[in-house]
Design a protein with these regions (language model features):
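C-terminal effector-binding regulatory domain of bacterial HTH transcription factors
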Residues: 106-110, 114, 124-168
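Short helices/loops that flank or line small-molecule/ion binding pockets
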Residues: 1-7, 88-97
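A ligand-binding cleft/hinge motif common to bilobed small-molecule-binding domains
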Residues: 91-117
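Acidic, Gly/Pro-rich loop/turn segments at junctions of secondary structure
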Residues: 1-84
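Short secondary-structure boundary segments
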Residues: 14, 37, 105-106, 123-124
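Short beta-strand->loop
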Residues: 23-26, 79, 114-126
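Alpha-helical segments flanking ligand/cofactor-binding loops in enzyme cores
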Residues: 24, 50, 91-92, 146
Length: 168
């Protein structure tokens, strides 16, 4: 798509699929499976990936969710009626008690600290995703792409919400 649209590069967040584009990881994206206290009170909290099938999932689309069980990666295809392509909308739906959501720490840190969202299924953490600068293959990247990439790497390195810690 970036080639057809004429873009020099794009930023992709998540797990990279195989493609013919060049990708440079600029930082990790850590997340958690979360639910509101109200949702947990009404429906309980899943304790294993298999139990997610009995819960409403708040999703971006038809994605799969991955969880770690020791050194094994478990993949689950959650089901749910609420779908949004906007992280803020998914956070709002989760805090409103509409279901469970796998969300990045950078969007949910304050909500978790305030008690509006609660980490669930913590025995099965999701593997860290990544933020990538992607570009068409071919020549060396233009200076503006290298500068953008370097700035993003610096930002991810300095922000506690992207470092995989529960920084206060």
């Amino acid at each position: 798509m970036i080639i057809a649209e004429g873009y020099d590069c794009a930023i992709r967040v998540g797990y990279l699929q195989d493609s013919n584009l060049i990708a440079r990881r600029v930082g990790p994206i850590h997340g958690k499976l979360l639910a509101s206290p109200g949702y947990i009170h009404a429906h309980g909290a899943p304790e294993t990936p298999d139990q997610l099938a009995q819960h409403e999932a708040l999703m971006q689309g038809t994605e799969t969710w991955q969880f770690m069980d020791g050194d094994k990666t478990l993949t689950v295809r959650p089901q749910g009626r609420f779908k949004a392509d906007n992280g803020a909308a998914l956070v709002a739906a989760a805090t409103a008690g509409l279901g469970v959501a796998y969300l990045p720490d950078c969007l949910t840190h304050d909500h978790v600290a305030a008690g509006a969202l609660v980490p669930i299924m913590t025995r099965y953490p999701p593997p860290p995703a990544g933020a990538y600068v992607i570009r068409p293959p071919g020549q060396h990247p233009a200076r503006k792409i290298r500068v953008l990439t370097d700035l993003l790497i610096e930002h991810f390195g300095q922000s506690p919400h992207f470092a995989g810690t529960d920084a206060e």
